[in-house]
Swiss-Prot record:
Its main location: mitochondrion. Component of the ubiquinol-cytochrome c reductase complex (complex III or cytochrome b-c1 complex) that is part of the mitochondrial respiratory chain. The b-c1 complex mediates electron transfer from ubiquinol to cytochrome c. Contributes to the generation of a proton gradient across the mitochondrial membrane that is then used for ATP synthesis. The cytochrome bc1 complex contains 11 subunits: 3 respiratory subunits (MT-CYB, CYC1 and UQCRFS1), 2 core proteins (UQCRC1 and UQCRC2) and 6 low-molecular weight proteins (UQCRH/QCR6, UQCRB/QCR7, UQCRQ/QCR8, UQCR10/QCR9, UQCR11/QCR10 and a cleavage product of UQCRFS1). This cytochrome bc1 complex then forms a dimer. Its cofactor is heme b. GO terms for cellular component: mitochondrial inner membrane. It comes from Chiroderma salvini (Salvin's big-eyed bat). This is Cytochrome b. InterPro entries: Cyt_b/b6_N, Cytb/b6-like_sf, Cytochrome_b_N_euk/bac, Di-haem_cyt_TM. CDD domains: Cytochrome_b_N. It is found in: Mitochondrion inner membrane. Gene3D superfamilies: Cytochrome Bc1 Complex, Chain C (1.20.810.10). The gene is MT-CYB. Heme 1 (or BL or b562) is low-potential and absorbs at about 562 nm, and heme 2 (or BH or b566) is high-potential and absorbs at about 566 nm. The chain crosses the membrane at residues 33-53, 77-98, 113-133.
Amino acid sequence: MTNIRKTHPLLKIINSSFVDLPAPSSLSSWWNFGSLLGVCLAVQILTGLFLAMHYTSDTATAFNSVTHICRDVNYGWLLRYLHANGASMFFICLYLHVGRGLYYGSYTYSETWNIGILLLFAVMATAFMGYVLP
């Protein structure tokens, strides 16, 4: 008797996409960090955009605007903490993503590896200019 998931027309499509997915055996949880980087980047952009709506960079009122965000804006404290901890999570995922590439020998694909290193340096320079210097 054949399995219904392999004979039914609709279930056959779902089975071939999710259950019997043709994936290499070396695919492990280390391969999730690329998509986690995308999620962290989206969270950083969205929370940064919403925080920038209420922040003033004037030296006399900057601290007051941060307290305004935390106290008066709906879930402003959550936006601030998501943005701060999201940056740390972004760099953790970034370093683990590069570490996975080193472990599996992705540096042999020189063009892809060099583009990734340029992106890594661009992210580090952006973080330095935006978070460390001010």
